[in-house]
From Swiss-Prot:
GO terms for cellular component: cytosol. Residues 300-310 have a biased composition (Basic and acidic residues). The lineage of its organism: Bacteria, Bacillati, Actinomycetota, Actinomycetes, Streptosporangiales. It comes from Thermobifida fusca (strain YX). Keywords: Protein biosynthesis, Transferase. It comes from the Bacteria. Attaches a formyl group to the free amino group of methionyl-tRNA(fMet). The formyl group appears to play a dual role in the initiator identity of N-formylmethionyl-tRNA by promoting its recognition by IF2 and preventing the misappropriation of this tRNA by the elongation apparatus. One of its GO terms (molecular function) is methionyl-tRNA formyltransferase activity. It catalyses: L-methionyl-tRNA(fMet) + (6R)-10-formyltetrahydrofolate = N-formyl-L-methionyl-tRNA(fMet) + (6S)-5,6,7,8-tetrahydrofolate + H(+). NCBIfam families: fmt. This is Methionyl-tRNA formyltransferase. Gene3D superfamilies: 3.40.50.12230. Its EC number is 2.1.2.9.
Amino acid sequence: MRLVFAGTPEVAVPSLDALLASEHEVVAVVTRPDAAAGRGRRLVASPVARRAAEAGIEVLKPARADDPAFLDRLRELAPDCCPVVAYGALLRQEALDIPRYGWVNLHFSLLPAWRGAAPVQHAILHGDDITGATTFQIERELDAGPVYGTVTEPIGPRDTSGDLLERLAKSGAELLVRTIDGIAKNELVPRPQGSEGVSYAPKLTPDDARVDFTAPALRVDRLIRACTPAPGAWTRFRGTRIKLGPVEPLPDAAPLPPGQLVATSRDVLVGTATHPVRLGEVQPQGKKAMPAADWARGARIGDGERFGDD
């Protein structure tokens, strides 16, 4: 089949590569416009745009998905199907109607659970043991179209959202190719999503990523892992923001008041509402990430100092 692939971030690149290696023809990609990045705020093409350029494929970067020039070019390309992975913009009905077999989205949850922009983060945040990826036909309602297929993935006790997304990007790419193969051979009929088990996963903001050490250790651990690498968990120390990497809950350790820091030559412990957690890496404002023990030696943490104090 003739395909136009839509995607933007790094997590979409394995799917593009898998489709390029398949028997189908990727005639173009659609991605978000170049965005400012780095300290110099220089415009940088998306990972999908860069990969497509390497492969010699036409790249479309509409500012709006209903841009008339974009829609005209999409019609000229005459795709049979448009696979989508984390494109990052809502598609209008006029665009949805162009390909003969519609737009097929790869979503990183087991729908109807965790519809929305941050399914992996919410799966970790809420303590799910299993997640996965789903291919489905895009319709106007968010992530609610009929399902072609799924693949499951266990969530490990130390998984971050970055770890989990990396695995799902690979297994999801294989699922997407199998789905496109099945559609091309008229072997797949999508099934409607059920009305039970629907949940939503809105994008996590920096405010959502602030760690509350008056919460139980389990919740602190899940929040930090869910927000790693993005948007990045953080707290405040001596009036400045400090980012926190994943922690290790210590259920057998002596309790500490929430947020209170205790540093040894090897470890830094922080109190929560239940038991302490051991810090891994921290990143003080304006500095690079470093082991928590190195940070504590440089900061010369005093008795009774705590995270969260402004």
